[in-house]
UniProtKB/Swiss-Prot annotation:
This is Putative uncharacterized protein YhiL. Residues 15-34 have a biased composition (Basic and acidic residues). It comes from Escherichia coli (strain K12). Residues 1-34 are annotated as: Disordered. Pfam families: DUF4049, DUF6860. SUPFAM superfamilies: Metallo-dependent phosphatases.
């Protein structure tokens, strides 16, 4: 939506006509008199002293004017019922038509998630009409015929996106096409756009004409990093008009990285919200390639991380799911050769993890239904490579294999050295946790973790075994060719790899923090995407 300056137009309190009850800011310190049952209630701006109580329409208006909820204990609980425990139900195309002024009316419905509650909440429909410099807003939750007439200059248009982005249905569609650029032009675009950003300066070379698997480590919630991985591996393309938008997206993620380092969370969230608005525009220029031959494995911590939002995470997961060999993916034109694994951030966090830790409500919505389809490990029998986010070890004392908070006792396996059987059991155990309704409620911040799940979440994050133990585990496992040991590739706490990595080591840790040596030969860390493909 075209920007509207956040200015307040003063309207005389003495003015009143037969069509409206006018409520000025100073009058609105008290409750709106709904007993009057007027057709239209008009006012300029709500402030911190406004008593809006259980009025859903007024809560919406306050958010649109201020960019956040009116904070008090009661409203916090109501937001959880209305938005944060709701099903994705808003059509983003309808929002875009309203934002582009193609239509002056926008109707959306919030459908509360009633799967795990005793008292059912009814869907709430909100109608917004923009006309003559005013917004006319009505909510079915008001249980009255009141329509609020709000000065358009008091509402910040971008706050519509901030309010609703987490509740957009994850039903993006992508055209399927062939690359229209020459190889030279495509390579030039990729280099000119990504080489300016520190996060991509040390990436290993990925050849989209090579059928060897490309591995990608932690991306920390950066949408740009997932787009980069899919671009260089030949799975997606971007039409010419989209590259300038991609530059803007990357610039905002880089500024968000700086805000994160300086612990300026308000700036971080604002930048990520703007990033998502840019992504919403960029989407129309992204297409899937029908001739991708390079298998890709994403090793986890791509969502639920420091640069995540619900909107960005849903986009990443929906895009990746279109290329996965998974139930429900019926698009035969796309090579289903992308594997996406869950890391501790996917498992533990819904949306931005710094916001969730602070119980800060950055945006509504839930990524659970997309996350729960992910496995935690994958075994490639052809290449004899075992991949996971954490790396798998053997605990001889406890007589089990360990992956994050999961354990597989040796005696639960038909063949205790079979890597494929081991991967299947780990994935089955992971799915049992993800399917637990209690797990879902805790992950969405609806309930505090039980002691058992608090321990589970902690162990999922804190599991950082030594490289030697991961290597020994690979030596113990036996594939179809017992003369070759099983190689492991993982993310999480790995030392990271850069463009100098030439050999396919027995173990490879592809973290976004890379170990390096300073002039005094001390280990230092730099942030950057780790990726590897054998050439």
């Amino acid at each position: 939506m075209k920007a509207i300056d956040n200015q307040i137009r003063n309207i005389s309190s003495s003015h009143q006509d037969k069509h409206s009850d006018k409520v000025n800011s100073h009058q609105h310190h008290g409750k709106v008199d709904k007993t009057h049952r007027a057709k239209i209630v008009e006012f300029d701006k709500l402030d911190n002293d406004s008593q809006i109580d259980n009025d859903f329409g007024l809560h919406i208006i306050y958010f649109l004017q201020h960019g956040h909820w009116k904070v008090n204990d009661r409203s916090h609980q109501m937001e959880k019922v209305w938005f944060y425990n709701s099903e994705p139900s808003i059509d983003i195309q309808e929002y875009n038509r309203f934002a582009d002024n193609t239509t002056d009316t926008f109707i959306f419905t919030i459908i509360p998630d009633n799967n795990h509650v005793l008292k059912l909440s009814s869907p709430i429909t909100v109608t917004v009409e923009c006309k003559g410099g005013y917004y006319f807003i009505n909510s079915s939750g008001d249980k009255s015929d009141i329509i609020y007439k709000v000065d358009g200059l008091s509402i910040i248009a971008r706050n519509f996106f901030t309010l609703l982005s987490g509740n957009f249905k994850p039903d993006w569609r992508w055209d399927v096409s062939k690359e229209t650029f020459t190889k030279e032009k495509f390579d030039s675009y990729v280099k000119s756009v990504f080489s300016k950003i520190d996060f991509y300066k040390q990436c290993g070379v990925i050849n989209p004409q090579n059928a060897n698997t490309a591995y990608f480590g932690d991306t920390d919630g950066r949408v740009g990093a997932v787009l980069y991985a899919l671009l260089v591996s030949g799975h997606i393309g971007i039409r010419e008009k989209g590259w300038s938008l991609l530059c803007e997206l990357l610039k905002h993620e880089e500024m968000a990285s700086s805000a994160y380092k300086h612990k300026n969370n308000k700036v971080l969230y604002d930048l990520l919200n703007t990033r998502d608005m840019i992504l919403n525009e960029l989407h129309q220029h992204v297409f899937l390639k029908d001739d991708a031959i390079t298998p890709c494995i994403f090793l986890g911590d791509h969502t639920g991380d420091r640069f995540s939002t619900i909107f960005g995470d849903k986009y990443i997961l929906t895009l990746l799911n279109s290329m996965r060999n998974m139930e429900g993916n019926k698009d035969s034109r796309i090579n289903k050769n992308v594997v996406v694994l869950a890391g501790n951030h996917e498992i533990n966090f819904n949306g931005n993890y710094t916001a969730r830790l602070a119980n800060h409500k950055l945006s509504a919505g839930d990524t659970y239904n997309l996350i729960k389809t992910l496995d935690v490990c994958n075994y490639d029998s052809e290449r004899q490579v075992l991949t996971s986010h954490h790396g798998i070890i053997r605990d001889e004392e406890k007589k089990c294999y360990c992956l994050g908070a999961l354990q597989v006792p040796f005696n639960q396996m038909k063949n205790p050295t079979d890597p494929e059987e081991l991967a299947n059991i780990f994935n089955k155990k992971h799915k049992e946790h993800m399917d637990d309704p209690l797990f879902h409620l805790i992950r969405s911040n609806t309930l505090k973790p039980t002691p058992v799940y608090a321990n589970y979440f902690d162990n999922t994050t804190d599991f950082r075994p030594a490289r030697e133990r991961i290597f020994i585990c690979g030596e113990t496992l036996k594939g179809e060719d017992p003369s070759k040991y099983i190689r492991q590739k993982y993310g999480h706490h790995g030392p990271g790899v850069d463009h100098n990595q030439q050999f396919d080591n027995g173990i490879m840790g592809l973290n976004s923090l890379k170990e390096a040596r300073d002039k005094n030969n001390k280990i230092i860390y730099s942030s950057g995407l780790s990726c590897f493909q054998l050439h």
